[in-house]
Amino acid sequence: MKRKTFFDSRDKYLSFVNSTNEKSKIAFYLFKKIEKISTRSPIFNVLDAGTGEGTIISTFLSGLHKYLPNKPIFVVGKEISIDDINVLLSFLGDRFAEHKTLIFNITNCSYKDLNNSTSDKVKFEKLELVGKKGIDFTKILMSLSPYIRKNWKLSFNNKNGSIKPKSKIFLTIYRKDQKKKLKDFIPRNISEIPKKYDFIIASQCFKLRSPLIQTCLLYTSPSPRDRFL
């Protein structure tokens, strides 16, 4: 049997993540890249290949707002951990207050699903945030915990140890008072999800077991290679 490493235990993994400043270091590193971004598109598309508990993407969005204060921002955040999503949601209230035209999508879909324009296996749902202040949005977002527990259940393969979602969900969150401005960017089905992104975040605090090239291709296939960090 292969020797276990710290990330095979969620408790050990969380202990490592929460006792280091690695995520903050990554977020500030990303700030340096934002300054070099130039885009003429009407919306800025971001893919976070694994949001975790949201420290990196939340901090990154605050920095992105500094450079693109008036441009709509569209984020696809991929995550299968119920615990991580609940923490992520607690961070996003202030981001929606800071950047009014933010569209934040949370999904448990695979990368293959996101790149398949004809898939009918993904359920699309929307949440319109009502309010003006960060605390208004935070209350709504944190009330989603039962919804997340219900829709982010996993199935386990006893033969190979793999896990996958029991159902595939794509949840789109935006401010209701910005719906008119954002209506052309709110996805209704898989074909309306961006296939190219202006910025990809693919950050893990450990060495993946999967082959590096295979993993990079999964992350970068929907985006220009020179934006991969």
Role assignments for model-derived ranges:
Residues L208-L218:
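A short, conserved alpha-helix within the catalytic core of class I
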Residues K2-S41:
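Class I SAM-dependent methyltransferase Rossmann-like catalytic core
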Residues T59-P194:
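Class I S-adenosyl-L-methionine-dependent methyltransferase module
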Residues P42-G52:
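Conserved class I S-adenosyl-L-methionine
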Residues I43, K196-D198:
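Local beta-strand N-terminus motif with an aromatic residue
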Residues G54-S58:
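Glycine-rich SAM-binding Motif I of class I
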Residues Y219-L229:
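Single conserved hydrophobic/aromatic residue that forms the stacking wall/gate
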Residues I201:
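A conserved beta-strand element that flanks and buttresses the S-adenosyl-L-methionine
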